[in-house]
Amino acid sequence: MKAPLSWLRDHVAIPADTTVDQLKDVFVRAGIEVEAVQEGAEVTGPVVVGKVLYRNPEEQKNGKTINWCVVDVGSHNPEEAPKDIPEGMHGRGIICGAHNFDVGDHVVVALPGAVLPGDFAISSRKTYGHVSDGMICSQVELGLPDDGTDGIIVLGDDAP
């Protein structure tokens, strides 16, 4: 059974300074076998919560449909709105291949300068005819365990 540390903390009082090795020792002393400990992958740089303001599915020549999105990332929005986003919207233009989200959803966004597991550096780049200024992330892209959800992380409406 895999049990994320965050889940354990939701159900058991674990002091904040407890290391994974100390926790493993507690389990073993209690007679609970620990086969392996999987450390999370490191993510560096700006990763923030954004709100999807606009989502336009665009079919490509290769048959793939991508989403041209505008995502409000608060204080991380560019000072000037990109030229190819709808008038009156202020946020970052981002290309996303996932389809499990919609306008109004809160999502996890890696901004240019972030480095995701596998040394995947996020930068502004032109792709599919737009400048994508970040990446809307899935659990796997952030190095989190795959929970079987196909697509990006959609947070609750109360996400900060």
Residues covered by each model-derived region:
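Phosphate-backbone binding interfaces of nucleic-acid-interacting proteins
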Residues: M1-P160
